[in-house]
């Protein structure tokens, strides 16, 4: 994923998939549930199945990262957007 400054994958969840975020370059503000961590190149985060999470470009340069989701085959929605729901809509200033 190539994410320009100020862009994001806002809060969402994957009902049937877990995800690993691996930062190649730039700075990611990674949320898993209501916990935030800052990730730099070579760092990663694991998001368990059905956990709310969001990835934000926290830097002034492009954020480049791998988003690895598993399993690849499942039934139901791949992504559920919760960015407008409480408490997710109030966790950060935009």
What feature does the model see in each segment?
Residues 10-11, 30-31, 47, 53-59:
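Short beta-strand His + acidic residue motifs that chelate non-heme Fe in jelly-roll/DSBH
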Residues 16-28, 33:
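Glycine- and acidic-residue-biased ligand/ion/polar-headgroup-sensing regions
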Residues 1-14:
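Conserved short histidine dyad/triad with adjacent acidic residue
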Residues 1, 21, 45:
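Conserved GNAT-family N-acetyltransferase fold
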Residues 1, 54-94:
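Double-stranded beta-helix
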Residues 34-50:
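Short acidic-glycine-tyrosine-enriched beta hairpin
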């Amino acid at each position: 994923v190539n994410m320009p400054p100020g862009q994001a994958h806002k809060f969402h969840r994957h009902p049937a998939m877990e995800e690993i975020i691996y930062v190649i370059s730039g700075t990611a503000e990674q949320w898993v549930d209501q916990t935030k961590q800052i990730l730099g190149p070579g760092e990663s985060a694991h998001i368990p199945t059905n956990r709310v999470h969001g990835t934000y470009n926290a830097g002034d340069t492009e954020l480049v990262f791998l988003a690895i989701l598993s399993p690849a085959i499942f039934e139901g929605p791949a992504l559920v957007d919760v960015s407008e729901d409480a408490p997710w809509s109030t966790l950060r200033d935009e």
